[in-house]
Amino acid sequence: MRAVLQRVSRASVTIDGTVKSKIDEGLLVLLGCENADTMEDITWLTHKIANLRIFNDEAGVMNKSILDVGGDILVVSQFTLWASYKKGNRPSYLRAGSHEVTVPLYEAFVREMEQEIGKPVMTGEFGAEMKVELLNDGPVTICMDTKNKE
């Protein structure tokens, strides 16, 4: 499971011209699943995201977590995080998980993330063509991979 976290002042997802979800201060999480992902990956990743200290404290030091600042989370499915570009110039997405496997993983991730932060998590729509708009704060962007635990 791969995730790209972006600390945002605001973010939103628009589908077919209609805003589906939006958040103010918090995290935009782009989430990519593969067939080998498990609930163990979800548990590790959601706990790490909830406790990662990437928000500024009073001294301007990144020393607070999403839990500390009470921020929101917007999760967007992103199969392109599994792009392989070893051969040619057109990315291959063979490592991206199948729809049958990744939809339940994505839904489980959202549920567990809600439990970790104690409030609803906003989402995009799995498999939809989306317009994601964000104001990156910092900018702070973190890439995570559950297989490497980094």
What are these model-derived regions, one by one?
Residues 95:
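An anionic oxygen-ligand recognition environment, strongly enriched in 2H phosphoesterase
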Residues 101:
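Phosphate/pyrophosphate-binding loop motifs in nucleotide- or prenyl diphosphate-using proteins
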